[in-house]
Each structure stands twice: as structure tokens, then as C-alpha cells.
């Protein structure tokens, strides 16, 4: 267990934002389904990206790692090279690859760690039942064994659990011999993630018609082509630095595509609504020290931003209400419960509701001991508000940032952050 003690300091300077995990997962999978070699550059080898690489190797894909790059020799005819696909704690890896594995008609078992073991997969179980695909699971939890062949046709999928199920099907269905349609039976949340998927499919030569978000039309017998791509910066990660810059002395965030399809790009507009001074320039965003005010924030399309927005709201003038956040309960932790618990430990006033948070802002927080709940976004959100603490902030389980942002603490230091690190036990 790693601990980090942060001495309250206002950060300033420039930081290069790590590449988007969401975009990289999709590029990796599309490249793996082509019949040629694709080169992917600007890759950050977070635990989740490593999980997808290892899982694809289990399906016969050849992947060579370079210095922040990947060379992928695709295999348009995937096969079960290893019958066990371990997804570590990556929900994207698991949910994206299950449908692809189901196109093979061979027995394969998916395993995982931590909260991933419990994250819901009912959307796929319903499909398996309707198509008579054999599956075995432990009361709905991992490990999951499947044996059968996915068929083209009409699919009915809930849109309010996770858009990852839609993405998983969109990767697999173009490979089948017949045409398919995915009908979304509830409001589709996190639409932007599906936009990223369809955009990436298009770059690799695969066409999907889904402009209405109510149904997606997928032609069968499509072929993925090899493509070289550079991974853009991650807006879910820039959120932490924008908040720290607003609470500090100003930060310039580099390596961003300000025309990105990433839904978390809305962080810029949310922060402006709260009073943050932000300027978007070509490939970068500058944030200046700002006084912030509470607002109502609908996070149905940007759930990953909730922890850091809650942290900022806790030191903003007035009251902030974060609504439509029920899905936060089935992430790496119950994020509504986790961020409420930890912010309140250090003097915040956060009220947890079933699907929302009400936050009454304070001038400062007191600091003290908090835990990450083994959740990377909780750890980074707490660090983001450390400059408003009157005493050092000690975060237990700080190593969890490796899941998405291995260089987070190094970047924190580079901007003037004062931290001490130590480990206890293994």
C-alpha cells in the first residue's frame, strides 16, 4: 500500500496531458482486427491499456511495444490462443472483447480483479440467452465462460447501464456474415463514447449508421484495414489539472485536440459556468486562478468527471448539485459514496443522495487522512483540492493512479507539488 502526503501548495506551470485511454482502447482493437500492420503512437502504458494488449494477445494478435508506441500485426481471423483472458480491473477490456470472443465459436473464459469481478454484464447475458450461446458465471460475476457463435440480426440493448456494451457489439457485428441492427431501448448515456467508437471504426474502414442514437445499422462482411494513428490527449485527465490551476496559480495543459469528440471535453464549459477563467488555444488549454461558484451539473453524459467536480464544488462559493449520477455506483468504487466520505473527512459538506450529490462549499478544507478506495479518479480528485487544505493531506492507496495515469504524481511534482511517498507492506 502506497501513501502520499501532500503539503498544501498552489500549483503552476505547463503539463503534457496523457493520451486518451478511451481512444487508445478503440485504436488497439480496430488495429487488431485488420489484416496488416498498424502503428499507434503517443501511447501511455497504463494498467488498463496493458490489460487490453494482453487480452488481444490471447486472441492471436501480435503486439510489439516501443517507446510510447505500439506496432500491431492484426489478425482478421482471431482465434483462442489462450483460453483464459484476464482483464485485470479494466471494464473497457472486458466489455469490448466479450462480443469479439463470441464470434469465434470456441470456449473462452474471462477473469478480472477488484470491483471488475462484480460489474454488471447482464446486457450480454440476455443476448447469450436469446441466441442460445452457452455461458457460465458465478452468480452473474466473473469468471465468465462462453462457448457459442454470435449471430447477425436485431439486438435490443439498454442504454442506461453502460455505453461499453454498444461499443463491444459495434466492434464485432461488422465481422459477421449478415447485417445487424442495435436498438437502444432506453436513453443512451455517455453518447460521446459511442461517437468515439464509430469515428475510430470509420478510420479503419468500417461503416456504422447510428446518427439517431436510437438504432445502429451495421452491414455484415466488412473488413478492417490497417491504419497508423496518434492518440490525442485525454480530457478526463485534463480535468484534474484545470481544477488545480484554478485553485492554484494557473496551469497550461498541452497535447489536446480542442475539436475532440471526447464527451469529457465538456469540463471546459462546466468550469466556465462555475467561474473559472479558461482559454482554449490550438493544442492546449490555459487556466488562470479563479473564484468559483456552485451550479447544477448534469453528469449523465460525463460520469468520470464527478469526483473532481465534487472536489472543486467543496471549495466553491454557494451550493452545487450534481445530478443524474446513479451509474457512479458501479465504477471502480461506488464513487458517490467514496467522494462523499473522503471529502467530508477533511471538512467538506457533501450530502449523498441516491443518484446525486449536494455540496455546500467551504472557504478551505482542513486536510488529514483519506483513502483512495483503490479508485484512480478518487485519488486524483482528492489531490486536486489539496491546495485548499490548511494541513497536509495524506492519501492511502495512492498507487491506484497507475490504472489510468501512471505519471500523475511525477507531473504533480513538476508543477510545484510538495509530496512525500512511502509504502507499507507489499
From Swiss-Prot:
<feature type="binding site">
    <location>
        <position position="190"/>
    </location>
    <ligand>
        <name>3-phosphoshikimate</name>
    </ligand>
</feature>
<dbReference type="Pfam" id="PF00275">
    <property type="entry name" value="EPSP_synthase"/>
</dbReference>
<keyword id="KW-0028">Amino-acid biosynthesis</keyword>
<feature type="binding site">
    <location>
        <position position="377"/>
    </location>
    <ligand>
        <name>phosphoenolpyruvate</name>
    </ligand>
</feature>
<dbReference type="InterPro" id="IPR023193">
    <property type="entry name" value="EPSP_synthase_CS"/>
</dbReference>
<feature type="binding site">
    <location>
        <position position="21"/>
    </location>
    <ligand>
        <name>phosphoenolpyruvate</name>
    </ligand>
</feature>
<comment type="pathway">
    <text>Metabolic intermediate biosynthesis; chorismate biosynthesis; chorismate from D-erythrose 4-phosphate and phosphoenolpyruvate: step 6/7.</text>
</comment>
<feature type="binding site">
    <location>
        <position position="22"/>
    </location>
    <ligand>
        <name>3-phosphoshikimate</name>
    </ligand>
</feature>
<comment type="function">
    <text>Catalyzes the transfer of the enolpyruvyl moiety of phosphoenolpyruvate (PEP) to the 5-hydroxyl of shikimate-3-phosphate (S3P) to produce enolpyruvyl shikimate-3-phosphate and inorganic phosphate.</text>
</comment>
<dbReference type="InterPro" id="IPR001986">
    <property type="entry name" value="Enolpyruvate_Tfrase_dom"/>
</dbReference>
<dbReference type="GO" id="GO:0009073">
    <property type="term" value="P:aromatic amino acid family biosynthetic process"/>
</dbReference>
<feature type="binding site">
    <location>
        <position position="163"/>
    </location>
    <ligand>
        <name>3-phosphoshikimate</name>
    </ligand>
</feature>
<feature type="binding site">
    <location>
        <position position="403"/>
    </location>
    <ligand>
        <name>phosphoenolpyruvate</name>
    </ligand>
</feature>
<dbReference type="InterPro" id="IPR036968">
    <property type="entry name" value="Enolpyruvate_Tfrase_sf"/>
</dbReference>
<feature type="binding site">
    <location>
        <position position="119"/>
    </location>
    <ligand>
        <name>phosphoenolpyruvate</name>
    </ligand>
</feature>
<feature type="binding site">
    <location>
        <position position="21"/>
    </location>
    <ligand>
        <name>3-phosphoshikimate</name>
    </ligand>
</feature>
<dbReference type="InterPro" id="IPR006264">
    <property type="entry name" value="EPSP_synthase"/>
</dbReference>
<feature type="binding site">
    <location>
        <position position="164"/>
    </location>
    <ligand>
        <name>3-phosphoshikimate</name>
    </ligand>
</feature>
<feature type="binding site">
    <location>
        <position position="304"/>
    </location>
    <ligand>
        <name>3-phosphoshikimate</name>
    </ligand>
</feature>
<feature type="binding site">
    <location>
        <position position="164"/>
    </location>
    <ligand>
        <name>phosphoenolpyruvate</name>
    </ligand>
</feature>
<feature type="binding site">
    <location>
        <position position="335"/>
    </location>
    <ligand>
        <name>phosphoenolpyruvate</name>
    </ligand>
</feature>
<keyword id="KW-0057">Aromatic amino acid biosynthesis</keyword>
<feature type="binding site">
    <location>
        <position position="26"/>
    </location>
    <ligand>
        <name>3-phosphoshikimate</name>
    </ligand>
</feature>
<dbReference type="GO" id="GO:0009423">
    <property type="term" value="P:chorismate biosynthetic process"/>
</dbReference>
<comment type="subunit">
    <text>Monomer.</text>
</comment>
<feature type="active site" description="Proton acceptor">
    <location>
        <position position="304"/>
    </location>
</feature>
<keyword id="KW-0808">Transferase</keyword>
<feature type="binding site">
    <location>
        <position position="91"/>
    </location>
    <ligand>
        <name>phosphoenolpyruvate</name>
    </ligand>
</feature>
<dbReference type="GO" id="GO:0003866">
    <property type="term" value="F:3-phosphoshikimate 1-carboxyvinyltransferase activity"/>
</dbReference>
<comment type="similarity">
    <text>Belongs to the EPSP synthase family.</text>
</comment>
<protein>
    <recommendedName>
        <fullName>3-phosphoshikimate 1-carboxyvinyltransferase</fullName>
        <ecNumber>2.5.1.19</ecNumber>
    </recommendedName>
</protein>
<keyword id="KW-0963">Cytoplasm</keyword>
<dbReference type="GO" id="GO:0005737">
    <property type="term" value="C:cytoplasm"/>
</dbReference>
<feature type="binding site">
    <location>
        <position position="331"/>
    </location>
    <ligand>
        <name>3-phosphoshikimate</name>
    </ligand>
</feature>
<dbReference type="GO" id="GO:0008652">
    <property type="term" value="P:amino acid biosynthetic process"/>
</dbReference>
<feature type="binding site">
    <location>
        <position position="162"/>
    </location>
    <ligand>
        <name>3-phosphoshikimate</name>
    </ligand>
</feature>
<dbReference type="InterPro" id="IPR013792">
    <property type="entry name" value="RNA3'P_cycl/enolpyr_Trfase_a/b"/>
</dbReference>
Amino acid at each position: 500500500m502506497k501513501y502520499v502526503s501532500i503539503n498544501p501548495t498552489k500549483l503552476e506551470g505547463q503539463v503534457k496531458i496523457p493520451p486518451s485511454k478511451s481512444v487508445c482502447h478503440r485504436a488497439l482493437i480496430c488495429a487488431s482486427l485488420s489484416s496488416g500492420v498498424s502503428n499507434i503512437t503517443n501511447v501511455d502504458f497504463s494498467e488498463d491499456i496493458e490489460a487490453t494488449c494482453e487480452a488481444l494477445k490471447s486472441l492471436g494478435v501480435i503486439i510489439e511495444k516501443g517507446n510510447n508506441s505500439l506496432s500491431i500485426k492484426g489478425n482478421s481471423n482471431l482465434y483462442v490462443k489462450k483460453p483464459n483472458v484476464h482483464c485485470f480491473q479494466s471494464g473497457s477490456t472486458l466489455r469490448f472483447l466479450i462480443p469479439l470472443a463470441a464470434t469465434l465459436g470456441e470456449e473462452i473464459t474471462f477473469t478480472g480483479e477488484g470491483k471488475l469481478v462484480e460489474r454488471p454484464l447482464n446486457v450480454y447475458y440476455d443476448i447469450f440467452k436469446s441466441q442460445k450461446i452457452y455461458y457460465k458465471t458465478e452468480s452473474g460475476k466473473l469468471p465468465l465462460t462462453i462457448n457459442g457463435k454470435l449471430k447477425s440480426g436485431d439486438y435490443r440493448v439498454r442504454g442506461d447501464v453502460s455505453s461499453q456494451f454498444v461499443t463491444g457489439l459495434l466492434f464485432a457485428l461488422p465481422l459477421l456474415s449478415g447485417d445487424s441492427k442495435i436498438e437502444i431501448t432506453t436513453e443512451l448515456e455517455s453518447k460521446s463514447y459511442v461517437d468515439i467508437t464509430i469515428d475510430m471504426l470509420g478510420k479503419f474502414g468500417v461503416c456504422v449508421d447510428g446518427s439517431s442514437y436510437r438504432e445502429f445499422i451495421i452491414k455484415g462482411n466488412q473488413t478492417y484495414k490497417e491504419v497508423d494513428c496518434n492518440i490525442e490527449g485525454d480530457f478526463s485527465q485534463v480535468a484534474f489539472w484545470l481544477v488545480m490551476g484554478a485553485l492554484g496559480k494557473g496551469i497550461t495543459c498541452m497535447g489536446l485536440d480542442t475539436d475532440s469528440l471526447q464527451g469529457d471535453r465538456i469540463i471546459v464549459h462546466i468550469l466556465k459556468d462555475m467561474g473559472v477563467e479558461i482559454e482554449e488555444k490550438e493544442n492546449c488549454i490555459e487556466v488562470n486562478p479563479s473564484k468559483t461558484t456552485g451550479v447544477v451539473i448534469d453528469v449523465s453524459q460525463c460520469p468520470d468527471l464527478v469526483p473532481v467536480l465534487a472536489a472543486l464544488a467543496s471549495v466553491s462559493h454557494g451550493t452545487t448539485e450534481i445530478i443524474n449520477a446513479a451509474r457512479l455506483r458501479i465504477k471502480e468504487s461506488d464513487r458517490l459514496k467514496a467522494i462523499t466520505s473522503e471529502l467530508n473527512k477533511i471538512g467538506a459538506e457533501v450530502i449523498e443522495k441516491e443518484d446525486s450529490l449536494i455540496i455546500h462549499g467551504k472557504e478551505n478544507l482542513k486536510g488529514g487522512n483519506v483513502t483512495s478506495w483503490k479508485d484512480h479518479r478518487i485519488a486524483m480528485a482528492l489531490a486536486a483540492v489539496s491546495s485548499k487544505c490548511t494541513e497536509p493531506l495524506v492519501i492511502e492507496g495512492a498507487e491506484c493512479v497507475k490504472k489510468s495515469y501512471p505519471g500523475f504524481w511525477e507531473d504533480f511534482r513538476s508543477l510545484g507539488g510538495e509530496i512525500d511517498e512511502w509504502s507499507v507492506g507489499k
